[in-house]
Amino acid sequence: GIILNDINRAYSGEKLEVEEYTSYDLALDNRDALASDAYKNAENYYKSVFENAGGSINFYPDKSGAAPTAEMYHRETSEFSVQDVKAFCKKHGITENVFFISAFGITLGKYNFRKDAVFTTIYHGRNDSRLSDTVGMLVKTLPVYCDFSGSTADCLNAVQQQLINSMNNDIYPFSQISHEFNIKADAMVIYQGDNFAFDNIGGEYAQEEPVQLNAAKAPVSISISIERNKFVFEIEYRGDMYNEETIKYLADNLETTADGILREYEPADIRLMFEEETKM
């Protein structure tokens, strides 16, 4: 992260640069943009993608607790390696972010016995080079429409182009998107990669300490990161809505989908565990 890098630079005796473009400057520019053609164009873009998409879907709850609770399930992937995914993405001209968002979308859609899915992701919000070293809450929620009725290649390419377009039109707020197109952050996927990996501060060994959750970001939110050269699924979920076994089963199915994509299977040929049961 930016702050950790600056702390390490300070410990090393480097001179720190003053922010040239601050989050306050961004807020002023965004205010002006609300009255510009950019805002209307962004609204029209989101309408073209989501107006007839039917709203977001989720993973059906299997219980109803008395009060909301936040739980976490941790899984290191074993079906495929970081190298497998990187090689696949390079071959097909997509990012690892697109790979996992698409795998999540296919999994979610199949859970709902559909060939498409609407859900959410987040991105860093730094779509302007002036923001590369700006400290602030720039992260934004983006809706995703994943259509996997055709080939895997078509699905991956469409998701990649859509994410690029959505980032370019991020002046249109998610609160408005949610209201206009009935899209809620009930099912969310976040690809972190190794962006937040660190093992020292100021030249001394440092270890990240997990913070106990008191509220879940969403009923189901999957964060995918790279740790010790393995992909890790951190699934944050509402313990009052889902049993841990249900979430473990979801992790199994997400791994199955990702592995199927790597094997060049078409979406219709990727069989999740419950589809095998149904088929039998």
Question: Which sequence ranges carry the predicted segments?
Answer:
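Acyl-group handoff/entry surfaces in thioester-processing enzymes
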Residues: 1-33, 54-60, 87, 91, ...
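Extended, hydrophobic beta-loop-alpha segments that form or line the acyl/peptidyl-thioester binding
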Residues: 1-8, 115-122, 149-155, 173-174, ...
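Short amphipathic alpha-helical face segments that pack within enzyme cores
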Residues: 2, 6, 95-107, 141, ...
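Phosphate/oxyanion-binding loops and surfaces in catalytic or ligand/nucleic-acid-binding neighborhoods
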Residues: 6-14, 48-56, 144-145, 162-169, ...
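Short amphipathic alpha-helices and their capping loops
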Residues: 9-10, 22-73, 279-280
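His-Asp-centered acyl/peptidyl-transfer active-site segments
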Residues: 33-43, 70-71, 89-97, 101, ...
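DNA breakage-rejoining catalytic core of tyrosine-based enzymes
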Residues: 70-82
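N-lobe entry segment of adenylate-forming
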Residues: 192, 255, 273-280
